[in-house]
Amino acid sequence: MNVTSLSFPYGESIQWFCADRTDKLPPSPLKEWLLAPGSLTKKLKTCCNQFEVKVLGEGQLAPFKDEYPQQGSVWVREVLLCLDNVPWVFARTLIPLSLLSEREADFLGLGSRPLGELLFSQDNFIPGRIEVASFDTGSRLAHLAASLDQRVEHLLWGRRRYFHHGQDEMIVSEIFLPAAERAICQ
């Protein structure tokens, strides 16, 4: 896997829209994956023998314009979710700095552990709304996919989900790479 042509952060500013605007969603079965209410990590694990999280980078950064409701820095974590050594999903998480000290979460010590397992195993993280976006073939994420030897021939689709913890809100974006879409839609 070669991701040296780009560097952290890989994400980009994009227009997200409410998932209930079904006229803009891709056809099934990818649509069902985008709108799945539970843990994407858990769903992905049912499709492989070996599940792995590859951390691309993490650190304190300013979010992209219109990416996060509050101004100022957040903790950004970008990973690839790989199934049987094939990257299926690019994930970008925005964590408010106030949550970094949350003892039960240990966001800074996650390493290669899946964030989804943490979020869906604790009652104090409440899943919120899902938004959906598409990324064209010239996007940074399409270039990332190409550097992973995955040709992007049409739009990449992704979702972002809000998680609430008290007064704090974190955002998890998950973009399906071409290998995932091929496997899901075959």
Swiss-Prot record:
Location in the cell: Cytoplasm
One cellular component term from this protein's GO annotations in UniProt: cytosol
GO biological process terms on file: pyruvate biosynthetic process; ubiquinone biosynthetic process
GO-annotated molecular function: chorismate lyase activity
Catalyses which reaction(s): chorismate = 4-hydroxybenzoate + pyruvate
Alphabetical keyword list: Cytoplasm, Lyase, Pyruvate, Ubiquinone biosynthesis
Pathway recorded for this protein: Cofactor biosynthesis; ubiquinone biosynthesis
Pfam family, one: Chor_lyase
HAMAP family per the UniProt record, alphabetical: UbiC
Family: Belongs to the UbiC family.
Name of the protein described by the UniProt record: Probable chorismate pyruvate-lyase
Organism: Shewanella sp. (strain W3-18-1)
Encoding gene, per UniProt annotation: ubiC
